């Protein structure tokens, strides 16, 4: 990289910090801090939703899959986008009108305090761990670009992303996400993809050089595709970071439209990334560590100035996910744990302060964990599996059935989480079967306990009566 590339990178970070300061001036209430006053239009929401789920693993991982197996690698990112779209089409009509802030708040309204607390803990741990992985990713990127020690890079990258998140909350993230979405789109679609195709001789070069298996959409195998759909599609449908973005929309129509656009964009983005990986195999067939496919290809094919934009695009993808998941974890803990159980009588001004302090503490914790574990990222697979296996079914049944009891939901969440953990322990942390086991146990438990627990059905609340009408 040349001085111009470093300058572009530096300007990018300065803009992010400046936006954080502006966001602090805008976020005066907890509602503004957590859901940006529920005032976003379709295009801003689309940019925010896209930016929050397309992180380092989506970008680096998809190009790696393209290098290793070809077009079949699109299932990784597309399964995430599909989950966001399905959430919009299946759930939004039934919940948008109730002004929720968290996924566990919905569990609480449907099934009571115990289920709300379990949901908050599981979802908060999951979102925090996602944030940790993104901090490690931004550290790795900065380390490679500036030749820093990884520890130094993690500290600097973590400080920048968490600085603007702590100050402005969702108002800051809205502005930074739209800005970062634009950088991502330009960097990948306008620069990296065409440059990679040009270096590889276009699509004809790919067809003439790569084996036919690289153009088979099911080459990874139906079992692996099913694993992605169960883990990432269901996980996205019950992810607090995704729900919180949807809650910023002005109305349900806007939210659903943005959700459909995300599904389309995820397909295009995943396609672009795997094609870049395929081009890298043609141009650089000897890459030993396939996690370096994207960065190696960028250094090989992108000219000065444009290279800075491309790496800023990668940084944008990573940092937008890190900030969004941090705020999601903070919202769950500050609202559904601290406020509900320890600070029950605080006014909104004090609650906003509690929210910022919680975000700060979690930011420090995320950086410490990132510095500590670095290579022990299998914890993410465990968190994703527990989230999808234990929370999805109670929410689905709670929204569409009148017969589920609080005891049934609580028992189903605990038993399914236990089942998933035992399954992962026996079959391995990368196995997809434990999620299936968890879902099956969840369904059996919630139906069986509800049947024998009829006498403990709660009186239908105004919230549940509203679901019946939606």
What would you call each of these model-derived segments?
Residues 1-470:
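Membrane-embedded helix-loop-helix hairpins and adjacent transmembrane boundary segments
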């Amino acid at each position: 990289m040349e001085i111009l590339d470093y300058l572009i990178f530096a300007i990018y970070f300065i803009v992010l910090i400046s936006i954080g300061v502006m966001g602090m001036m805008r976020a005066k209430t907890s509602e503004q801090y957590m859901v940006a006053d529920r005032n976003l239009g379709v295009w801003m929401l689309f940019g925010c939703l896209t930016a929050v789920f397309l992180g380092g693993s989506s970008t680096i991982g998809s190009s790696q899959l393209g290098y290793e197996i070809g077009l079949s690698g699109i299932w990784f990112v597309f399964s995430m986008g599909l989950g966001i779209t399905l959430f919009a089409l299946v759930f939004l009509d039934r919940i948008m009108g109730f002004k929720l802030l968290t996924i566990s708040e919905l569990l609480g309204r449907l099934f009571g305090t115990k289920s709300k607390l379990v949901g908050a803990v599981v979802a908060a741990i999951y979102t925090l761990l996602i944030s940790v992985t993104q901090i490690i990713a931004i550290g790795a990127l900065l380390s490679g670009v500036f030749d820093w020690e990884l520890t130094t890079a993690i500290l600097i990258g973590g400080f920048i992303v968490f600085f603007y998140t702590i100050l402005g909350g969702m108002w800051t993230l809205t502005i930074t996400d739209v800005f970062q979405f634009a950088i991502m789109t330009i960097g990948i679609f306008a620069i990296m993809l065409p440059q990679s195709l040009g270096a590889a001789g276009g699509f004809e070069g790919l067809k003439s050089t790569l084996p036919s298996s690289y153009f088979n959409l099911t080459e990874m195998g139906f079992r692996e595709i099913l694993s992605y759909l169960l883990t990432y599609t269901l996980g996205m449908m019950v992810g607090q970071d995704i729900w919180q973005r949807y809650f910023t929309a002005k109305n349900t129509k806007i939210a659903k439209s943005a959700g459909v656009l995300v599904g389309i964009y995820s397909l295009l983005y995943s396609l672009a990334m795997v094609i870049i990986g395929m081009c890298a195999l043609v141009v650089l067939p000897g890459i030993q560590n396939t996690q370096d496919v994207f960065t190696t290809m960028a250094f090989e094919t992108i000219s000065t100035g444009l290279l800075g934009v491309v790496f800023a695009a990668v940084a944008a993808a990573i940092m937008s996910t890190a900030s969004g998941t941090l705020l999601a974890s903070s919202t769950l803990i500050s609202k559904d744990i601290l406020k509900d159980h320890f600070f029950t009588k605080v006014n909104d001004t004090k609650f906003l302060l509690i929210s910022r302090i919680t975000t700060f503490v979690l930011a420090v914790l995320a950086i410490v964990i990132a510095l500590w574990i670095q290579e022990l990222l299998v914890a993410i697979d465990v968190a994703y599996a527990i989230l999808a296996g234990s929370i999805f079914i109670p929410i689905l049944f709670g929204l569409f059935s009148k017969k589920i009891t609080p005891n049934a939901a609580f028992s189903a969440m605990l038993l399914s989480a236990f089942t998933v953990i035992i399954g992962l322990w026996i079959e391995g942390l990368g196995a997809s079967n434990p999620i299936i086991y968890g879902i099956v146990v969840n369904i059996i438990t919630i139906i069986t306990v509800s049947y024998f627990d009829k006498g403990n059905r709660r009186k239908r609340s105004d919230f549940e009566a509203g679901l019946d009408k939606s």
